[in-house]
């Protein structure tokens, strides 16, 4: 079946807006389709036609956490936010730490996901940090990469072994960097906010010391080491130095760490509680600078839904994490592109081709022959963030009430429309 997306514009290699019709056949982008062969047509007049967004850090919670989110609700949220490919973190119950569990997870993905879902496998059995999983069997079963995200690998020897195993299979080790001996039972960053509210704080070095250790281990193992949700200036410096030394390290940053710091926390609202925590303003500034200079490779949401009951607890007792799939692009476009800090092309690249290239994925592009994963965006449309409108089960966001521009209007995965607003017609 052939389709034509007409009237929109794309960004060329220089970031210039160019009017472009996009032709789709059999789920792939093609150069042209004869008018007589077109069976569906979308009116994208005035819309940016972007490659579908790629998010390599999403918590879908299923199996075991279906009260927070399911594969179905999480991928519907992804589609609404313009994401066509997401990678699902393994901190579920049970953990996908063997081929059988990974097979069951992939069957569930096939049944209920509305966007493409790539499953992570865990580095260690049950994510306990004590025994390596069977990397070879998990790769053969379809693992995207290996991570124990949610907890850090505490033993250097265990991490080195994991990196050697992954390197032999040309797979990435993806790390949540946190030294348990330095957490201090903290709920927020160890800074002036913690002091003012009498709270235990998590120091910056809790994250940075693991990165400093791991880049040396990655060098020794010859592994691709990817750092999740970088949050501190020390981490940025360490990654920058490692890249200069030729170590194969990549890194991501979340929208919330780019947008917020501890100064922005309102009262003791648990919707401002995430891990890693919101750091100092100089850390936030270092993250923006690191993204701009290439130290940080791309943006990932760390979408982490929780129930309203869980997030209604005190700041000290509520779980870490916020949702992000449905707010990422509008927030970043409004607060970084419109003021001129980022170009539109930079933002699109950090959400598409950059994560795809980092993990050797054939997505995030509008090239002929690529999967027809498209996100159609009205850059002039405005909305106020309203959690009651989220398709995610999780409503836990610190951005409620924020006004944003740049609203996704439709999302297509392999040529199939998985999300749309009213203006997309003639399906």
From Swiss-Prot:
Name the keywords, alphabetized.
Answer: Hydrolase, Metal-binding, Pyrimidine biosynthesis, Zinc
Name the Gene3D superfamilies for this protein.
Answer: Metal-dependent hydrolases, Urease, subunit C, domain 1
**Reactions that this protein is recorded to catalyse:** (S)-dihydroorotate + H2O = N-carbamoyl-L-aspartate + H(+)
The cofactor remark states:
Binds 2 Zn(2+) ions per subunit.
PANTHER family given in the database record: ALLANTOINASE
Kindly give the HAMAP family that the UniProt entry links to this protein: PyrC_classI_B
> What does the UniProt function comment say about this protein?
Catalyzes the reversible cyclization of carbamoyl aspartate to dihydroorotate.
Record family assignment: Belongs to the metallo-dependent hydrolases superfamily. DHOase family. Class I DHOase subfamily.
Q: Supply the name of the protein.
A: Dihydroorotase
